[in-house]
Each structure stands twice: as structure tokens, then as C-alpha cells.
Amino acid sequence: MRVPDFTHVVLVVFENHEASSIVGNPDAPTFNALGRRYARLTRYYAVAHPSLPNYLALVSGSTHGITSDCTDCIVGTRSLADTLTAAGKTWRVYAEGLPRSGFTGGSAGEYAKKHDPFLYFAAIANSRAGRDRVVPFTRLSRDLAAHRLPGFSLIVPNLCDDMHDCPVATGDTWLKEHIVPLVHSPELLGGVVFVVFDEGTSDVGGGGHVDALALGPTVRPGSSFSKTTNHYGLLRTIEDAWGLPRLGLSAKATPIGGIWKG
């Protein structure tokens, strides 16, 4: 399946809800309106429990045998950050509640390292330049205003806004306030925003059947992708868009297709 050569890719990750608790839920009007306007990936699955292995899978194609939300474990293999950098692409993590760039602690207020996967890779954790690409969420508005949105952005809401500790309605409001304006930003005219959940509450597919959306001007309005996919398929889609090497199990995954314009 052909994937567009996106100008920008933004990945937003919410927490711990099955698709059945989002799709059609009156407390999630923004999720459902966006799903109707753009594209919903109707058979999208998380790959593991708990949170951390899913985040690692999203950015490296493997859970690396990690089965906990450890905060001191380190992975020595490549991640999407490495392949992006090698291809001349820029990347950044915008983490809500992160005290400052370079912070590597396990938690701070409503920020949780377990939802910030790049800091688990040695090439980033042991590099000042790498750590400095993980920044507080407040940096996003400045980067947009300065037309400095990186090629790839991972947006990590805090433990309340991602629905981990707060109701669905809270996350939906956050999506409306922060991500809808981003979708409509001039920076995203040739880009895409993926909105997914790290895991569900069941073991279906390894980590539950979760809601997933593809948003933006490159998406065919009112479309859907109904083939079975997961975090590895999403990673494969990003890799194919930019001709990046396929990491881990993304090599065996099918890219997301049938929802793109042109």
C-alpha cells in the first residue's frame, strides 16, 4: 500500500481504554466527530500490557522483553529516533508536565516516564543532544509559531489528560483544545496526525482493541481502514512514508492504506 511522503507526522497517545469505551460514547464527542470527518482505524490493537511495552513497540517495533513499567531499564537497540536522524529528519517529544528538557526521573506530578519511550533508549538517554529533544508540552505552541515543527512529533498528554487517571470527557476536551487546532495548522497541510491508545483493558490482540484515528489534509474524508493492524503497523506506515529502515516487527506489518488522498 502506498503511503504519502508526509511533510510532518504527529503521534498522540492516550491511555487505557478499549475502542468500545470511546466509539459512540457521548463523553467523547471530539474523538467521534474526528473519526467521521477523517479516518478511523477500526481494527487497531495494542500489543501488550502494561503501558511501557506498547510505547516501545510504537517507536522501535519491539517490546524488548519488557513486561513492566520500569523506569530504570535501558534498551540498547535502535529506535525511530535513530532512523529519522540518519535520514536527515528531525524529531521531538512534547511531554505534558515534564519539568524541563533533560529530565530523566521516573515521575513528576502528572508526568510519567513510562509514557515517554525514547528516554529508554541508550542512544538518547546517554546523550545530552538526545535528551534535549524531549521537551515540555508548552514548547509546541512556540515551535508552531516559529514554523519549527519537527518532521516527527510524539505528543504525550499528562496522566489526567491522557485518561489514565481522569474520565474520558477530560481527554476529549484536551483533544479538542490542543490537537484539533494542530490538525488545522498550516504546518500540517502535507502532514498527518495519528491519535491512538497505548493499550486497552482486554488481552485481545495482545493489549486490547483500541481506538485509532488518522487526521489531517492528507486523509480522505470519511474513510476507514478495516484491516487488522497494531502499533507495529503504525510504525511501518511512518517508515514507508519516508523510506526508513524497518525496525523489529514493523518489517512483518502491513502499512495503513486506503485512507490517503491522491
Identify the role of each PLM range:
Residues 1-262:
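N-terminal pro-sequences and low-complexity stem/linker regions of secreted or lumenal proteins
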